[in-house]
């Protein structure tokens, strides 16, 4: 019964981009930089994480999860996970967006639950 009242962890996400560009004609997005996930609440164990790029407010693009985050991750209160990331994602259709955000979700328990979202960062267009 206690599992029914499990609280969503208090997490904060931050992306510090070195490269953030959408190539409209090549139908791809390239992101590189450092992704930081900070635990602003109690000790927590994170499982079944996924990352989604939200561009232009509506376009959602799945991103590969860093290797260290693919297994169960235990975070103490106030701790941070830092990963250098470098994604180049091919798109099915051209995309033009001036900014984007990265959303951290969990699919634990069979449902998609958002855990944290980065602040919007500029997305260049080529």
Residue ranges of predicted features:
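A short beta-turn/strand-edge loop motif at beta-sheet boundaries
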Residues: 25, 38-48
